[in-house]
Amino acid sequence: MLTEITFFERFEHDILMGKKTITLRNEAESHVIPGQILPVSTFETHRWFCDIQVLEVTPITLSGLTTLHAQQENMTLAELRLVIAEIYPDLEQLYMIRFKVLTK
């Protein structure tokens, strides 16, 4: 089970402002449960910037992503698919982790 989660620094503002409310992860990074509280750090420097509470974990495929998922990521669907392809090349099976920010 994950005990912390990291995000690229470019997503920090959107997370803190409540504009990014989900994250899409591979199977290895999907081991969280609803209700779990995780410290959040930047991927680049591991600087803590908030805590989140996991609300939901749902399997989803790359081809199953919708505009709603993109809105929850504060992106267009095209941008979301591009970002996922950069982070997880050639991966179809993803896991959507919906969360809320607890502390800033």
Curated annotation (Swiss-Prot):
Disulfide bonds: none annotated. Keywords: Hydrolase. The active site is at 20 (proton acceptor), 23 (nucleophile), 73 (proton donor). Gene3D superfamilies: Hypothetical protein. Pfam families: ASCH. It is an enzyme of class 3 (hydrolase). GO terms for cellular component: cytosol. It catalyses: N(4)-acetylcytidine + H2O = cytidine + acetate + H(+); N(4)-acetyl-2'-deoxycytidine + H2O = 2'-deoxycytidine + acetate + H(+); N(4)-acetylcytosine + H2O = cytosine + acetate + H(+). One of its GO terms (molecular function) is hydrolase activity, acting on carbon-nitrogen (but not peptide) bonds, in linear amidines. InterPro entries: AC4CH (IPR008314), ASCH_domain (IPR007374), PUA-like_sf (IPR015947). Residues 6-101 form the ASCH domain. Its EC number is 3.5.1.135. Belongs to the N(4)-acetylcytidine amidohydrolase family. PANTHER family: UCP029143 FAMILY PROTEIN. Catalyzes the hydrolysis of N(4)-acetylcytidine (ac4C). This is N(4)-acetylcytidine amidohydrolase. It comes from Shewanella oneidensis (strain ATCC 700550 / JCM 31522 / CIP 106686 / LMG 19005 / NCIMB 14063 / MR-1).
